[in-house]
UniProtKB/Swiss-Prot annotation:
NCBIfam families: rpsB_bact. Residues 246-283 have a biased composition (Basic and acidic residues). The keyword Cell membrane does not apply. One of its GO terms (molecular function) is structural constituent of ribosome. This is Small ribosomal subunit protein uS2. Pfam families: Ribosomal_S2. Belongs to the universal ribosomal protein uS2 family. Keywords: Ribonucleoprotein, Ribosomal protein. One of its GO terms (cellular component) is cytosolic small ribosomal subunit. InterPro entries: Ribosomal_uS2 (IPR001865), Ribosomal_uS2_bac/mit/plastid (IPR005706), Ribosomal_uS2_flav_dom_sf (IPR023591). It comes from Cutibacterium acnes (strain DSM 16379 / KPA171202) (Propionibacterium acnes). Residues 229-283 are annotated as: Disordered.
Amino acid sequence: MAVVTTRQLLESGVHFGHQTRRWNPKMKRFIFTERNGIYIIDLHQSLTYIDKAYAFVKETVAKGGQILFVGTKKQAQESIVEQATRVGMPYVNQRWLGGMLTNFQTISKRIARLKELEAMDFDKVSGSGLTKKELLMLSREKDKLEKDLGGIRDMPKVPQAVWVVDTKKEHLAIDEARKLKIPVVAILDTNCDPDEVDYAIPGNDDAIRSVSLLTRIIADAAAEGLMARSAGKSGEQPAEAEPMPDWERELLEGDGAKTEAKAEEPKAEAKKADEAPEAEKSN
């Protein structure tokens, strides 16, 4: 079954690029035609690249990897949160903080601080030993950290891949991922540089419907990878048989000895019966 159809891409406006005066010549091979001063993206190529990106994300997640969803522009914020949360993946939809990947050790300390503040009860002034002003300042600190780092609070280490909406706007995320050799999966509009991306999807990164559709496809790939991972875990480690208690082993061994003895009795009787006629003949 196809991941997505050409009709779905058309209905979501994935084929609309930027104005012809705002383009990157490196994207020429992905452009189908020009219409009314706007480039039209070749959706047949988009379908092919979607399949490649889908397979990569699925395999990465199936092997235990995480995909970081990144999209801070207004058109992407809602779908980034919705789809990443649906499949339990980390996300950044407000602001990319410098060093989120390349200086993750420091970011981890800020995440620990966020969790520390979340554990505090800001309504109990008397029991906290702090003034109202101090509690207010701590509450504001928590809100700021939640806004900036809430999406990656459960990300234990740098991700194994990054999904990016609008590579030009998220150039900091792209740069950090490339420094760490983290594969980048991204929508490539006609003004983008395809050399910055490992798994490109030629498409419209400005329209809400286009961004939502493509982000959902990547989330679906992650969901399928999670199912494959779960199935692999259940199949790889079969439950070991419990060791047999000593009393049960002795009982079975005793029964076995009795069975062997009973089996020998008919043989002995048959041997005696055979020996009897021989004795009569000799007499």
